[in-house]
């Protein structure tokens, strides 16, 4: 087994262990037992449990980002792009695998409560916001708009909405209500969009300034 494959198998095993026993139960011994590997295999693949946790966060965020990007359709308006991306995240990341989302929330809480690894929570949300910023920039270019606020601020708002959407659904499993939230979020976020300046607009503005 290659090092890349070994790392992947360990991350998958860690996700299963955390979903079943929580982050505190995800010891290196428990993870390698779930993966069917030796303890030496873990230390061959990762230098520490902290490094493995970072890899786990990166894996889940990347999976969610791929799902959201795959929902973007060229030629659609920004509201449709927002709705489709949130729906893809909700259906493919939350509903299809709620255990992953529970793991991510628990990982953040565990990091915040554990001295020395608080940075993991910050890194987790840095990754979320960076991924969403990329989606927002792609969606804006596709729809011919620009954001009336800095894209980093819009990304922070989207992450806040998706957190509430996810936690609400994990608590009540009311999919219909979650879809209504997505529609409302698409309405609200699309109001932060404004037409992007065209080449003719730029030329006109330049002439006016020169006059």
Give residue ranges: language-model regions.
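Helix-turn-helix
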Residues: 6-9, 13-55
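Hydrophobic/aromatic-rich alpha-helical bundle segments in the mid-to-C-terminal region
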Residues: 116-122, 140-204, 209-211
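Amphipathic alpha-helical packing segments from all-alpha helical-bundle domains
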Residues: 98-105, 115-141, 153
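Alpha-helical DNA-contacting segments of helix-turn-helix folds
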Residues: 2, 53-60
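Hydrophobic core segments within long, regular secondary-structure runs in both alpha-
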Residues: 79-87, 129, 133, 179-190
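Short loop-to-helix capping motifs
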Residues: 48, 110-115
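Conserved alpha-helical segments that form or flank metal/cofactor-binding pockets of metalloenzymes
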Residues: 60-70
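Hydrophobic alpha-helical connector segments
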Residues: 55, 69-101, 151-158
């Amino acid at each position: 087994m290659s090092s890349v494959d070994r790392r992947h198998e360990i991350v998958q095993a860690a996700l299963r262990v955390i979903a079943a026993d929580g982050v505190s139960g995800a010891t290196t011994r428990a993870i390698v037992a779930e993966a069917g590997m030796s303890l030496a295999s873990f230390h061959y693949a990762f230098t520490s449990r902290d490094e493995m946790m970072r890899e786990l966060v990166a894996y889940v965020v990347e999976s969610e980002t791929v799902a959201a990007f795959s929902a973007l359709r060229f030629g659609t308006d920004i509201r449709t792009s927002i709705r489709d991306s949130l729906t893809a995240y909700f259906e493919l990341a939350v509903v299809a695998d709620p255990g992953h989302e529970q793991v991510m929330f628990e990982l953040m809480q565990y990091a915040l409560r554990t001295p020395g690894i608080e940075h993991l929570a910050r890194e987790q949300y840095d990754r979320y916001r960076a991924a969403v910023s990329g989606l927002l920039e792609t969606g804006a270019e596709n729809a011919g708009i620009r954001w009336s606020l800095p894209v980093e601020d819009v990304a922070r708002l989207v992450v806040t909405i998706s957190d509430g959407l996810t936690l609400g659904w994990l608590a009540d499993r009311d999919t219909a209500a979650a879809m209504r939230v997505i529609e409302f979020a698409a309405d609200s976020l699309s109001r932060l969009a404004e037409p992007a300046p065209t080449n003719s607009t730029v030329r006109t503005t330049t002439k006016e300034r020169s006059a």
